[in-house]
Amino acid sequence: MRTSQFLLATQKETPSDAVVVSHQLMLRAGMIRKLASGLYTWLPMGLRVLRKVEAIVREEMNAVGALEILMPGIQPAELWQESGRWEQYGPELMRLVDRHNREFCLGPTHEEVITDLARNELNSYKQLPINMYQIQTKFRDEIRPRFGLMRGREFVMKDAYSFHADNASLQVTYDRMHLAYSNVFSRLGLKFRPVEADNGSIGGAGSHEFHVLAESGEDDIVFSNGSDYAANIEKAEAVPREKARAAATEELRLVDTPNAKTIAQLVEGFGLPIEKTVKTLVVHAAEEGKLIALIIRGDHELNEIKASQQELVASPLVMASEAELRDAIGAGAGSLGPLNLPLPCIIDRSVELMSDFAVGANIDDKHYFGVNWERDLPVPTVADLRNVVAGDPSPDGQGTLEIKRGIEVGHIFQLGTKYSEAMKCQVLGENGKPVNLAMGCYGIGVSRVVAAAIEQNSDENGIIWNDTLAPFQIALIPLRYETDAVREATDKLYAELTAAGFEVLLDDRDKKTSPGIKFADMELIGIPHRIVVSDRGLAEGNLEYKSRTESQPQAIAVADVLSFIQGRVKR
């Protein structure tokens, strides 16, 4: 490809509304252009990269026997009402009404559509297992689209769905898809971690997320420094560092705390160690009209996913209002605690092991100090309620936990019979009786992968593509292309490289574009290999080669360039 025949749309300045590196560089490198908030046009340079990601995903899906299909992007509300997700999904679901007043949505995912397809096309266990996938545009009405392709309202996704006669068969396919996902991200040259995850609104049982490691990631991922244990922050089990509760050494006392509405104020005002304080968070209970208290240590954060999964707690989690607190307890949020609390409590595991600690007295501006379990109050229900923190013991007993930032690029789920039961998706089993199909679903954020790769591979000059993902493998830059010798040598090499199967971008912009600008553009775009053709080099029988990751160029004999490149470019 010649730049004279290509839309080379590089920009020198960084757009003011682009915060993360991938968004900045994709705009500057001419890969995408913003149409509206969360909506982007893929330009030729970016689309070449996107298609390469799609090709690798497609190859790995085909390799595990998945069948490619293409489902409608617009889905009827009736299917979502059958599954129960029409009301559950919330405002992120883009809804519309046609001229006949029928309700539809723009699909953020396709569980309902594929289940409808399966119940109409499958009738016997002999047709199972079956795994079908598509690569398609999805839609989500994000409240605050941000970070370019990281969190947009329209995105490209590969979603696959498998159907099985039983959970044992589902597990086999799930394991194969887990390996296929690892193959995809390994082939793309990404540093990634698969982690245990929560199923969220998709539903079902077990799941894993695949995260590209990057400081700009929105997710915290947790892993052990002594084993293969890894989970996202929502799923990671919090194990107390303490082995047992220390003996009581203080007397219980009621203390006036007029200026201590927060844990920080309590710690600062009374010289308490923060690990000797607790937070009492009152939420709506599963029983309508009731409240329940969740209690964690003062230096810990409530894990809302874990909390909402407690049998006695309403899901989704709803915090009690100040008015509800006053009505039920008679005190405000800054003065609550488990001692004499007229509500049921669930305490975190680490709270159970505390002694001589401080709690709100359920009286405004008062706290109890020197509180101890069993002496002053009974131990209530104990559960894992908090986020892990770095240094916690690994749940598998091997090593301690570390936390890094990650960008979620893939998620696989064992759905079980959640959708097949709701939508009556059955086949006749071996015994001739109807069987609800066990399902798996498997997603890769194809367009997000492109952005994640840039977050992981860039420098002050631009993107650093590997040979697998680069829009072009080689930038061929002639200096003074208008001269006969340079033009002849450049055109000959271009023909040889393209005939050998290399993807080459020949920068044939005229002399008004300086060599410095050409070099800077190719560095910005991130093309991994650069060859420069010049009068001076040709006079010496050489061309100049430079890798995107090397600081200094090297001279290569004209006769050796093709074999040299064949040895450098990974294909």
From Swiss-Prot:
PROSITE patterns: AA_TRNA_LIGASE_II (PS50862). It is an enzyme of class 6 (ligase). It catalyses: tRNA(Pro) + L-proline + ATP = L-prolyl-tRNA(Pro) + AMP + diphosphate. One of its GO terms (molecular function) is proline-tRNA ligase activity. One of its GO terms (cellular component) is cytosol. Consists of three domains: the N-terminal catalytic domain, the editing domain and the C-terminal anticodon-binding domain. This is Proline--tRNA ligase.
